[in-house]
Curated annotation (Swiss-Prot):
Its cofactor is heme b; heme c. Pfam families: Cytochrome_B. This is Cytochrome b6. Heme b 1 binds at H100, H202. It is a multi-pass membrane protein. NCBIfam families: PRK03735.1. The keyword Transmembrane applies. One of its GO terms (cellular component) is chloroplast thylakoid membrane. The chain crosses the membrane at residues 32-52, 90-110, 116-136, 186-206.
């Protein structure tokens, strides 16, 4: 077994990477509140896993969406548990993200030279809120439908470009199948991809710059 490991280590420098990860200096002032970002990341992984599981049964059409959610909750083995974990983890992710932002702000973690780390974090915060807005509509029940109608109607107040933005979000003048398709695509592909990319950038910058010192 050691020969196999040595073969890979010679080519990929596995041990050097492992040593770098395990020997990173942690400042003495770090406490439990510095774990909030990691908890948010864990919630994101739970969201990806449970969301992926539900895509096998969910149908993104205005006719079948609600029925498919009911099927997940009542017929699929442990479907009720998977969807419940998805919902609970979503709430936890938003809460932990908010607390993480407050911790970084209060400890000055956004200051030079960590401005870009802060910027990527703000972008991920926007993505997190967008997850909530798009996911809320997917069951396509009364609450989801009217939430979409209200949210997509907000940009209409913007002068000149407002109506164009509304039509772009809805996929037409009114809320319908095109709207659900857009929100489903955003929720299951666009937003997860963007979040993963900015998370990678966020983590790499933290690894490079280290954790900010105490105030």
């Amino acid at each position: 077994m050691s020969k196999v490991y040595d073969w890979f280590d010679e080519r990929l420098e596995i041990q050097a990477i492992a040593d770098d990860i395990s020997s990173k200096y942690v400042p003495p002032h770090v406490n439990i509140f510095y774990c909030l970002g990691g908890i948010t990341f864990t919630c994101f992984l739970v969201q990806v896993a449970t969301g992926f599981a539900m895509t096998f049964y969910y149908r993104p059409t205005v006719v079948e969406a609600f029925a498919s959610v009911q099927y997940i909750m009542t017929e699929v083995n442990f479907g009720w548990l998977i969807r419940s974990i998805h919902r609970w983890s979503a709430s936890m992710m938003v809460l932990m993200m908010i607390l993480h932002v407050f911790r970084v702000w209060l400890t000055g973690g956004f200051k030079k030279p960590r401005e870009l780390t802060w910027t990527t974090g703000v972008i991920m915060a926007v993505c997190t809120v967008s997850f909530g807005v798009t996911g809320y509509s997917l069951p396509w029940d009364q609450v989801g439908y009217w939430a979409v109608k209200i949210v997509t109607g907000v940009p209409d107040a913007i002068p000149v470009v407002g109506p164009t933005i509304v039509e772009l979000l809805r996929g037409g003048v009114g809320v319908g199948q095109a709207t659900l398709t857009r929100f489903y695509s955003l929720h299951t592909f666009v937003l997860p991809l963007l979040t993963a990319v900015f998370m990678l950038m966020h983590f790499l910058m933290i690894r490079k710059q280290g954790i900010s010192g105490p105030l």
